Amino acid sequence: MPKFSEQPQSEVRQRLLDGMIRYMKLAGNDCGYKKADVAQCMKIIDGYLAALGEGKSSKLSEPKIREAVKKAVLDLNRLNEKCGGSLIETDQREYLCQLLLVAARRAGLKTRDDITEAWREW
């Protein structure tokens, strides 16, 4: 399991967004996804962070956290598949895993394992 820094989630989210937009501009029509797909990715992430109560002090049960992770990963799988697998590349995968796993730990998940691997197709 890679060690992720405890930098603010907003910074990691912004790097993810910037990387997707930068590649889209560089590759043009050949990138495989559109601004709407990037917006949908951010919506999935924001919904996930909200479901975990990001920024709140209360902790969730481990089953609730795992269910939120599973939903976000499956939603991202579907979106990436819709984009022909081009939306989530290596850099994006690392940022997404960091966002998902750090938020899960902050919400109360005890494991240091990468629980996204059970469902992740990217």
Predicted regions and their residues:
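Surface-exposed polar/charged interaction patches
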Residues: 19, 23-26, 51-58, 79-82, ...
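Arginine residue identity/basic-tract feature
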Residues: 13-15, 22, 66, 78, ...
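Amphipathic alpha-helical binding modules
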Residues: 3-6, 83-122
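Generic structural signal for well-ordered, non-transmembrane alpha-helical segments
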Residues: 39, 46, 70-77, 94, ...
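Mature extracytoplasmic domains of secretory-pathway proteins
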Residues: 45-79
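Alpha-helical rod/repeat scaffolding segments in eukaryotic adaptors/tethers
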Residues: 31-34, 54-65, 82-93, 97
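Short terminal alpha-helical segments
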Residues: 1-54
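Generic alpha-helix signal with a bias toward terminal, lower-confidence helices
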Residues: 16, 28, 56-57, 77, ...
